[in-house]
Amino acid sequence: MRGDVRVHTASPIAAAWLLAVGLVAHAEEPPTVALTVPAAALLPDGALGESIVRGRRYLSDTPAQLPDFVGNGLACRHCHPGRDGEVGTEANAAPFVGVVGRFPQYSARHGRLITLEQRIGDCFERSLNGRALALDHPALIDMLAYMSWLSQGVPVGAVVAGHGIPTLTLEREPDGVHGEALYQARCLACHGADGSGTLDADGRYLFPPLWGPRSFNTGAGMNRQATAAGFIKHKMPLGADDSLSDEEAWDVAGFVLTHPRPLFQEPTGD
Protein backbone atom coordinates (compact mmCIF):
# COMPACT_ATOMS: atom_id res chain seq x y z
CA MET A 1 0.00 0.00 0.00
CA ARG A 2 1.28 3.49 -0.86
CA GLY A 3 0.29 7.08 -0.42
CA ASP A 4 0.04 9.60 2.34
CA VAL A 5 -3.19 10.74 3.98
CA ARG A 6 -2.97 13.51 6.53
CA VAL A 7 -5.83 13.80 8.99
CA HIS A 8 -6.27 17.19 10.65
CA THR A 9 -8.62 17.83 13.55
CA ALA A 10 -9.97 21.09 14.91
CA SER A 11 -12.64 22.32 17.26
CA PRO A 12 -15.98 21.52 15.58
CA ILE A 13 -17.45 24.91 16.53
CA ALA A 14 -14.34 26.75 15.39
CA ALA A 15 -14.30 24.86 12.10
CA ALA A 16 -17.95 25.65 11.45
CA TRP A 17 -17.40 29.33 12.35
CA LEU A 18 -14.41 29.65 10.04
CA LEU A 19 -16.32 27.99 7.21
CA ALA A 20 -19.31 30.28 7.71
CA VAL A 21 -17.14 33.40 7.85
CA GLY A 22 -15.27 32.34 4.73
CA LEU A 23 -18.45 31.78 2.77
CA VAL A 24 -19.95 35.10 3.84
CA ALA A 25 -16.73 36.97 3.09
CA HIS A 26 -16.56 35.61 -0.43
CA ALA A 27 -20.35 35.88 -0.93
CA GLU A 28 -20.40 32.83 -3.15
CA GLU A 29 -21.74 29.31 -3.13
CA PRO A 30 -19.44 26.44 -2.12
CA PRO A 31 -17.63 24.99 -5.13
CA THR A 32 -18.94 21.83 -6.77
CA VAL A 33 -16.36 19.16 -7.54
CA ALA A 34 -16.50 15.83 -9.34
CA LEU A 35 -17.09 12.63 -7.40
CA THR A 36 -13.70 10.91 -7.61
CA VAL A 37 -12.83 7.68 -5.78
CA PRO A 38 -9.19 7.03 -4.77
CA ALA A 39 -7.57 3.90 -6.17
CA ALA A 40 -7.34 1.08 -3.63
CA ALA A 41 -3.64 0.75 -4.49
CA LEU A 42 -3.09 4.19 -2.94
CA LEU A 43 -4.11 3.11 0.55
CA PRO A 44 -1.44 4.28 3.00
CA ASP A 45 0.82 1.81 4.75
CA GLY A 46 0.83 1.10 8.46
CA ALA A 47 -1.76 1.76 11.14
CA LEU A 48 -3.74 4.32 9.14
CA GLY A 49 -4.15 1.99 6.17
CA GLU A 50 -5.26 -0.80 8.48
CA SER A 51 -7.80 1.53 10.09
CA ILE A 52 -9.19 2.50 6.68
CA VAL A 53 -9.59 -1.16 5.69
CA ARG A 54 -11.38 -1.93 8.97
CA GLY A 55 -13.65 1.07 8.46
CA ARG A 56 -14.64 -0.19 5.02
CA ARG A 57 -15.41 -3.61 6.53
CA TYR A 58 -17.63 -2.11 9.26
CA LEU A 59 -19.60 -0.13 6.67
CA SER A 60 -19.92 -3.08 4.31
CA ASP A 61 -20.80 -5.84 6.77
CA THR A 62 -22.24 -3.86 9.66
CA PRO A 63 -24.56 -6.43 11.32
CA ALA A 64 -21.88 -9.13 11.48
CA GLN A 65 -19.08 -6.76 12.51
CA LEU A 66 -21.05 -4.72 15.07
CA PRO A 67 -23.92 -6.95 16.23
CA ASP A 68 -24.29 -5.12 19.55
CA PHE A 69 -25.13 -1.88 17.74
CA VAL A 70 -27.36 -3.10 14.88
CA GLY A 71 -30.97 -4.06 15.53
CA ASN A 72 -32.01 -5.24 12.07
CA GLY A 73 -30.50 -6.86 8.99
CA LEU A 74 -29.25 -3.75 7.21
CA ALA A 75 -25.65 -2.72 6.58
CA CYS A 76 -24.48 0.81 5.81
CA ARG A 77 -23.77 -0.24 2.21
CA HIS A 78 -27.46 -0.87 1.56
CA CYS A 79 -28.18 2.87 1.61
CA HIS A 80 -24.61 3.95 0.71
CA PRO A 81 -23.66 1.58 -2.13
CA GLY A 82 -20.31 1.52 -3.87
CA ARG A 83 -18.47 -0.22 -6.67
CA ASP A 84 -15.34 -2.36 -6.84
CA GLY A 85 -15.52 -3.31 -3.17
CA GLU A 86 -15.93 0.22 -1.86
CA VAL A 87 -18.83 1.66 0.17
CA GLY A 88 -20.44 5.06 -0.25
CA THR A 89 -18.98 5.90 -3.65
CA GLU A 90 -22.05 6.09 -5.91
CA ALA A 91 -23.63 9.38 -6.94
CA ASN A 92 -27.17 10.14 -5.74
CA ALA A 93 -26.91 7.50 -3.00
CA ALA A 94 -25.45 9.57 -0.14
CA PRO A 95 -21.78 9.00 -1.07
CA PHE A 96 -19.14 9.43 1.62
CA VAL A 97 -16.76 11.22 -0.75
CA GLY A 98 -16.25 14.74 0.61
CA VAL A 99 -18.53 14.23 3.59
CA VAL A 100 -15.88 14.96 6.23
CA GLY A 101 -15.50 18.49 4.88
CA ARG A 102 -19.21 19.27 5.23
CA PHE A 103 -19.40 18.70 8.98
CA PRO A 104 -20.13 20.08 11.50
CA GLN A 105 -23.40 21.19 9.93
CA TYR A 106 -26.80 22.31 11.12
CA SER A 107 -29.36 19.53 11.57
CA ALA A 108 -33.00 20.53 11.24
CA ARG A 109 -33.87 17.18 12.81
CA HIS A 110 -31.98 18.10 15.99
CA GLY A 111 -32.32 21.87 15.76
CA ARG A 112 -28.60 22.38 16.34
CA LEU A 113 -25.12 21.91 14.95
CA ILE A 114 -23.98 18.27 14.85
CA THR A 115 -20.73 16.49 14.04
CA LEU A 116 -20.20 13.70 11.53
CA GLU A 117 -19.82 11.29 14.44
CA GLN A 118 -23.28 12.27 15.67
CA ARG A 119 -24.72 11.93 12.17
CA ILE A 120 -23.37 8.39 11.95
CA GLY A 121 -24.96 7.72 15.33
CA ASP A 122 -28.29 8.83 13.90
CA CYS A 123 -27.95 6.25 11.14
CA PHE A 124 -27.26 3.48 13.63
CA GLU A 125 -30.29 4.43 15.72
CA ARG A 126 -32.68 4.93 12.82
CA SER A 127 -31.64 3.14 9.62
CA LEU A 128 -30.03 0.24 11.50
CA ASN A 129 -32.63 0.31 14.31
CA GLY A 130 -29.82 -0.02 16.84
CA ARG A 131 -27.81 2.28 19.06
CA ALA A 132 -25.08 4.82 18.47
CA LEU A 133 -21.44 4.01 19.12
CA ALA A 134 -19.57 6.05 21.72
CA LEU A 135 -17.69 8.94 20.13
CA ASP A 136 -14.37 7.30 21.01
CA HIS A 137 -15.35 3.78 19.92
CA PRO A 138 -12.56 2.25 17.79
CA ALA A 139 -15.02 1.17 15.08
CA LEU A 140 -16.35 4.71 14.72
CA ILE A 141 -12.80 6.04 14.43
CA ASP A 142 -12.10 3.46 11.71
CA MET A 143 -15.24 4.45 9.79
CA LEU A 144 -14.16 8.09 9.95
CA ALA A 145 -10.72 7.09 8.68
CA TYR A 146 -12.32 5.41 5.67
CA MET A 147 -14.51 8.42 4.94
CA SER A 148 -11.49 10.72 5.29
CA TRP A 149 -9.55 8.58 2.81
CA LEU A 150 -12.43 8.75 0.32
CA SER A 151 -12.58 12.52 0.82
CA GLN A 152 -8.91 13.30 0.20
CA GLY A 153 -8.43 16.17 -2.21
CA VAL A 154 -11.97 17.51 -1.74
CA PRO A 155 -11.86 21.11 -0.42
CA VAL A 156 -13.53 21.76 2.93
CA GLY A 157 -17.11 22.83 2.36
CA ALA A 158 -17.15 21.75 -1.29
CA VAL A 159 -20.23 20.07 -2.72
CA VAL A 160 -19.45 16.78 -4.44
CA ALA A 161 -21.53 16.15 -7.56
CA GLY A 162 -24.17 13.55 -6.72
CA HIS A 163 -23.97 14.15 -2.96
CA GLY A 164 -26.86 13.09 -0.75
CA ILE A 165 -30.04 11.51 -2.06
CA PRO A 166 -32.03 13.78 -4.40
CA THR A 167 -35.58 13.97 -3.11
CA LEU A 168 -38.56 13.48 -5.39
CA THR A 169 -41.95 15.03 -4.70
CA LEU A 170 -45.12 14.97 -6.77
CA GLU A 171 -48.22 17.04 -6.10
CA ARG A 172 -50.43 14.02 -5.52
CA GLU A 173 -50.74 11.15 -3.10
CA PRO A 174 -48.94 7.92 -4.07
CA ASP A 175 -51.06 5.39 -5.95
CA GLY A 176 -50.67 2.24 -3.86
CA VAL A 177 -52.35 -0.03 -6.40
CA HIS A 178 -50.02 1.13 -9.16
CA GLY A 179 -47.08 0.93 -6.76
CA GLU A 180 -47.90 -2.66 -5.84
CA ALA A 181 -48.10 -3.69 -9.50
CA LEU A 182 -44.74 -2.06 -10.19
CA TYR A 183 -43.22 -3.68 -7.10
CA GLN A 184 -44.31 -7.12 -8.27
CA ALA A 185 -42.90 -6.50 -11.74
CA ARG A 186 -39.64 -4.70 -10.91
CA CYS A 187 -38.74 -5.28 -7.23
CA LEU A 188 -40.13 -8.62 -6.06
CA ALA A 189 -37.38 -10.79 -7.58
CA CYS A 190 -34.77 -9.25 -5.27
CA HIS A 191 -36.74 -8.02 -2.26
CA GLY A 192 -39.37 -10.77 -2.03
CA ALA A 193 -43.14 -10.83 -2.14
CA ASP A 194 -43.22 -10.01 1.56
CA GLY A 195 -40.46 -7.38 1.38
CA SER A 196 -38.15 -9.52 3.50
CA GLY A 197 -35.15 -9.32 1.17
CA THR A 198 -32.77 -12.02 -0.04
CA LEU A 199 -30.00 -13.63 2.00
CA ASP A 200 -26.72 -14.87 0.56
CA ALA A 201 -25.11 -18.22 1.41
CA ASP A 202 -23.54 -16.70 4.54
CA GLY A 203 -26.83 -15.41 5.91
CA ARG A 204 -26.12 -11.78 5.02
CA TYR A 205 -28.60 -9.65 3.12
CA LEU A 206 -27.67 -9.52 -0.54
CA PHE A 207 -30.84 -7.49 -1.10
CA PRO A 208 -32.18 -5.77 2.02
CA PRO A 209 -35.62 -6.09 3.60
CA LEU A 210 -37.83 -3.13 2.73
CA TRP A 211 -40.31 -3.55 5.57
CA GLY A 212 -40.90 -5.75 8.57
CA PRO A 213 -38.80 -6.26 11.72
CA ARG A 214 -35.47 -6.53 9.87
CA SER A 215 -35.84 -3.23 7.98
CA PHE A 216 -35.21 0.43 8.88
CA ASN A 217 -37.40 2.00 11.54
CA THR A 218 -39.90 4.85 11.34
CA GLY A 219 -37.26 7.44 12.25
CA ALA A 220 -35.02 6.66 9.28
CA GLY A 221 -34.61 9.10 6.43
CA MET A 222 -35.69 6.37 4.03
CA ASN A 223 -39.06 6.33 5.78
CA ARG A 224 -39.75 9.73 4.20
CA GLN A 225 -41.77 9.49 1.00
CA ALA A 226 -39.66 12.05 -0.90
CA THR A 227 -36.36 10.42 0.10
CA ALA A 228 -37.48 6.87 -0.67
CA ALA A 229 -38.89 7.97 -4.03
CA GLY A 230 -35.66 9.77 -4.90
CA PHE A 231 -33.53 6.76 -4.01
CA ILE A 232 -35.75 4.41 -6.01
CA LYS A 233 -35.76 6.80 -8.97
CA HIS A 234 -31.96 7.12 -9.16
CA LYS A 235 -30.71 3.73 -7.93
CA MET A 236 -33.40 1.11 -8.54
CA PRO A 237 -33.87 -1.46 -9.92
CA LEU A 238 -30.28 -2.53 -9.34
CA GLY A 239 -28.33 -2.24 -12.56
CA ALA A 240 -31.09 -0.24 -14.23
CA ASP A 241 -30.65 3.18 -12.60
CA ASP A 242 -33.09 5.89 -13.67
CA SER A 243 -35.22 3.41 -15.61
CA LEU A 244 -38.36 4.28 -13.63
CA SER A 245 -40.30 7.46 -14.30
CA ASP A 246 -40.88 9.97 -11.50
CA GLU A 247 -44.47 8.75 -11.24
CA GLU A 248 -43.42 5.11 -11.01
CA ALA A 249 -40.78 5.77 -8.35
CA TRP A 250 -43.27 7.84 -6.37
CA ASP A 251 -45.88 5.08 -6.38
CA VAL A 252 -43.42 2.28 -5.55
CA ALA A 253 -42.15 4.29 -2.57
CA GLY A 254 -45.71 4.88 -1.43
CA PHE A 255 -46.46 1.16 -1.60
CA VAL A 256 -43.31 0.19 0.32
CA LEU A 257 -43.93 2.74 3.07
CA THR A 258 -47.48 1.55 3.75
CA HIS A 259 -46.08 -1.59 5.36
CA PRO A 260 -45.19 -1.99 9.05
CA ARG A 261 -41.67 -1.52 10.33
CA PRO A 262 -39.97 -1.01 13.72
CA LEU A 263 -41.11 2.07 15.63
CA PHE A 264 -38.45 4.67 16.43
CA GLN A 265 -38.82 5.24 20.16
CA GLU A 266 -37.09 8.59 20.63
CA PRO A 267 -38.65 12.03 20.06
CA THR A 268 -37.99 13.17 16.50
CA GLY A 269 -37.90 16.54 14.77
CA ASP A 270 -38.65 15.00 11.39
Swiss-Prot record:
Recorded consequence of changing residue 123 to G: Loss of function
SUPFAM superfamilies the UniProt entry points to: Cytochrome c (SSF46626)
Coiled coil (UniProt feature): none
Signal peptide: 1-27
Source superkingdom: Bacteria
Residue span, Cytochrome c domain: 44-158, 174-260
UniProt KW Ribonucleoprotein keyword: no
Sites where the protein binds heme c 1: 76, 79-80
GO MF: electron transfer activity; heme binding; metal ion binding; thiosulfate dehydrogenase activity
Chief location of this protein within or outside the cell: periplasm
Protein name, UniProt field: Thiosulfate dehydrogenase
Cellular component terms per the entry's GO annotation: periplasmic space
Modifications the protein undergoes after translation, according to the UniProt entry: Binds 2 heme c groups covalently per subunit.
Binding of heme c 2, residues: 187, 190-191
Enzyme Commission code: 1.8.2.2
Catalytic activity, reaction form: 2 thiosulfate + 2 Fe(III)-[cytochrome c] = tetrathionate + 2 Fe(II)-[cytochrome c] + 2 H(+)
Location in or out of the cell: Periplasm
Function according to Swiss-Prot or TrEMBL: Catalyzes the oxidation of 2 molecules of thiosulfate to tetrathionate.
UniProt entry keywords in alphabetical sequence: Heme, Iron, Metal-binding, Oxidoreductase, Periplasm, Repeat, Signal
Entry's pH dependence statement: Optimum pH is 4.2.
Effect of a null allele: Cells are unable to produce tetrathionate from thiosulfate.
Subunit (UniProt): Monomer.
